[in-house]
Amino acid sequence: MKELSIASSEFHTVEELQEYIKIGLHFPDYYGENLSALYDCLTQSADPIILEFDVDGFFDDTMKQYFKKVGKVCEDAVEENELLEFSVILPKEEGW
């Protein structure tokens, strides 16, 4: 089983986040570090995966929007792969 917890405030760039996901979930070297590649790896995984997003702040609006896109990809992947679990810990403030 692969487990990965992602705290939104720890990432300043898309590249940092994608690299963290790649390493944390042991994705192959050919992982494209983009949303399409993320979806492909999540839906094709034969290993159980648990992903948890802790939305605890953002470096900037670009990262906030990207986290929303990653969350949508994960939600879509859950529908295709029963071995995938995805949860989000939302902040108390509005706007997510």
Task: Give the location of each predicted region.
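Positively charged, polar, low-complexity stretches
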Residues: 1-96
